[in-house]
Amino acid sequence: MGKVYLVGAGPGDPDLITLKGLKAIQQADVILYDRLVNKDLLEYAKSDADIIYCGKLPNYHTLKQETINNFLVKFAKKGKIVTRLKGGDPFVFGRGGEEAEALVQQGISFEIVPGITSGIAAAAYAGIPVTHREYSASFAFVAGHRKDSKHDAIKWDSLAKGVDTLAIYMGVRNLPYICQQLMKHGKTSATPIALIHWGTCADQRTVTGTLGTIVDIVKEEQIENPSMIIVGEVVNFS
């Protein structure tokens, strides 16, 4: 029986992967990697390693999650060392929990290798501290891809009134809705907000504004996915 490593590749800059994550790449017989993994990291793989792309775009998945789970199990049962390489951290909106469940159900040995998530790293590369002694004592990760209130389980009231800094993932297409919900539930229109496109990468771009102005700014600057959204007074440090 082989073993599976669920590895966080970090937010984009290849230098931000952990040493343990790098070792998992170097020893793997099979690597399954996602769209937001910097491909430079694949250069550390063994020359005879099988490398499989599992990238996902909004509304389009190269491989369905169930297929990925089955691959992990299949290769491990063949005695392979399998590295599942994910952007950021595997347990922060990376579906790593689902993959771990599948491995447990099949009795597959596995290990979690945490990675630096873009909610912290992209903000840092833009000069934004997600916490600050004077401005932010609380911080939350939020999934921003729910398209309407009918399918939205996010507790916007709690986020708007109870959290100082928000890092919102996968939210660019939903930006008008996100801003609307935050203002509806207590944030003022003057609340600072930043969008960081391709955070930590060579072509990173950052735009800033307020909840009341950012939708027009993003449209004018043509900011698209992948982008991290940071909301809170700490944005003023950018």
From Swiss-Prot:
The gene is cobA. This is Uroporphyrinogen-III C-methyltransferase. It is a step in the biosynthesis of both cobalamin (vitamin B12) and siroheme. Belongs to the precorrin methyltransferase family. Pathway: Cofactor biosynthesis; adenosylcobalamin biosynthesis; precorrin-2 from uroporphyrinogen III: step 1/1; Porphyrin-containing compound metabolism; siroheme biosynthesis; precorrin-2 from uroporphyrinogen III: step 1/1. The lineage of its organism: Bacteria, Bacillati, Bacillota, Bacilli, Bacillales. SUPFAM superfamilies: Tetrapyrrole methylase. SUMT exhibits a substrate inhibition phenomenon at uroporphyrinogen III concentrations above 0.5 uM; this property might play a regulatory role in cobalamin biosynthesis. CDD domains: SUMT. It comes from Priestia megaterium. GO terms for molecular function: uroporphyrin-III C-methyltransferase activity. It holds the Pfam family TP_methylase. It is an enzyme of class 2 (transferase). Its EC number is 2.1.1.107. Monomer. One of its GO terms (biological process) is cobalamin biosynthetic process.
